[in-house]
Amino acid sequence: MKEQITYDIFDKVDIRVGTVISVKKNEKARKPSLVVEVDFGEEIGIKQSSAQITHYYSEENLKGKQVIAVCNFVEKNIAGVVSQVLILGSIDKEGKVILVHPSQSSENGLPIS
């Protein structure tokens, strides 16, 4: 387990629900990656992320799906892509990412607490 944090620290993390609207391969990345655009509703808008999720996910099975992401992460340039959010997932025994998503359809932009 990682170091414990206080509620005040956790409360600073802005985690939201969004819907994937586009997916394409990041051809410049050293490791197979996808550039994912996610709609987080009116308040936050559309944000993009570069994610190493190609083992289980593709444009065909990811577009239209809802995901959970950290929306106030500092932007990072990853292989020519400005990654604006961090899409959340669990990591299986082989190191492959399994995305976290709501169990029911949710409004884009709803906060996770």
Task: Label each PLM-derived region with a short phrase.
Residues M1-S113:
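Phosphate-backbone binding interfaces of nucleic-acid-interacting proteins
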